[in-house]
Amino acid sequence: MKLTMYMGRAGTGKSYACYERIREIITTCPGEPIILLVPDPATYRTERELAAFMPEGGFTTVRVVGFGRLAHQVFQSLGKAREDSLSDIGQKLVLRLLLKRHADKLEVLRRAASQPHFADVLQGLLAECKAFRVTAEDLRSGADKVDSMGLAGKLRELAYIKEQYETMTDNLWGSDEDSMEELIRCIGDSPLLQQAHVIVDGFHWFTPLQNILIQRMFALAKESILTVTLPAETEPERYARPGQLFYRPYEVYATYKERYGKQLLVRRFTKQHRFQSPVLEALEKGYFAYPSQGNQSKDTVAVVRAYNREREVDAICRRISSLVREEGYRWRDITIMLRESETYGDILEKGLAQYGIPFFTDRRHPMRSHPLAELLTGLLEIVQSRFNHDAVFRLLKTDFFPLSREEVDLLENYCLEFGIRELMWLKPEWTYRRRDTGPEGSDSYERETLRVSRIQNIHSRIVPLWQLLWDFGRQSHTGYEWCEHLYTCLESLHVPRTLSQWSREAVAEGLQEEADSHEQMYKRVIRFFDEVMLLAKTELLAPDEIAVLLREGLDEVTYSLGPPGLDHVAVTTVERGYTTESAIVFV
């Protein structure tokens, strides 16, 4: 089977040639399936570009997919779509349970295993092992070859954890690599790949597991095309030294050159089409060149320095407004590219909103401060802290309780005034009142009586839940029982109904992002409960252990949104920055 490789620098027309080939296939071979595999963050942009490229403004026989979407569609075509795959939170839960169960067998990693978020590190390590096809036996073999006893011990314990993890998740799909292995096994049975035209575009490098999948797809395909970002004006072997700028694309070339030999047809692209500015074209060609060359054009790249991030963002927003208002650009012509979203994300979003600039950011927003997250962690915290004042009122101010904010403030002032703390919350009645209220029957006495009566009414609405939490939350229970209890608490507080109401109110006010956050948060919490009940159904968990699991699980919960329209400023990061056709880019 032949493989056509499109080779060229960035902007030389490789993707455009892929679109042209797709249009040609649709014209000459209507009905034949086409698979366009691109990086997951690029699927939305690629679909839009390809639809705009087609004469009819759309397509029906082309599937634009990333690895994740490809797996889902193949499994769906075979009736293998499964709901019991583990989320990232579920995978970390498995690892934390394993570390708890087998703590006595860990000597080198025992101290690290007790640290917060160690499961995150372990999950990433196991995912890397899977992607690079490193088995537990490989880890043990490596342990036998190293001189350091500490390193050897770590490798052996990692091998043991890896085996236990794979055993525990044998009937579940965990990481993306797990689904990819299953995809490799069954992709040949799917009708989606039978006699399909397969085009792979936008990647700089592949893991060994991805390489196996792509080669399997090419073997099933009627036609195969792969793009590689390598300078076509020189021989690829020039970049064969590790550490060079184009070394990883060269590895892709070398891998497929070795596999296909004379069946590999290389089409070279040398003419630059993307960069309209001479300085950008020179920058792309010479930035990593040696010896370095100066700018020979009259154009320059503006480098702006600001006093702090807020002023930097303000300058960007003013410049964007000027470009649109005075120079005829549209919002969609502009992209802001960040090194990482955490540093600038909130500041930038606030600045763009203040200037009335429509924007879309592809970052995932953390949900740890969502009222539902505060509620769940607070339900456990008040028991652990024996009804600490701050914990109690942080919980009451989530607005899920049948109390108004005025009533919460009234209750808080009363508790501060009379020193109500800890187990005093569980008393069925509070009779504390001010002494200097005058004789019985006086106006001041009646006002105080009315105030105490109101406080008692407020207290009576929450003390049953406090008592339920206290009676249940002091002892160890199975993961199933903990989740059942927490869900019962959510139901008793009418949390689903409240979130639905908040979501409708947000939509009515035009706050679609806030509305979506309520819906996604509730779904993720229910998913978390499902996974705990599945994985720790009979596992006894102490109150502090379930609290750690819940806290770490909620820390991982994020939400993302789709673009609200087509005309907006795109805010992305270097790693996810596939919006390469913008006329104006702020880095």
Annotate each language-model stretch with its function.
Residues 63-69, 197-206, 210, 225, ...:
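Conserved helicase core region in the C-terminal RecA-like lobe
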Residues 31-141, 149, 153:
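Conserved P-loop NTPase-based nucleic-acid remodeling module centered on helicase motor cores
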Residues 55, 70, 102, 106, ...:
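ATPase/helicase motor core of nucleic-acid motors
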Residues 148, 152, 156, 164-165, ...:
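Accessory C-terminal helicase-associated subdomains
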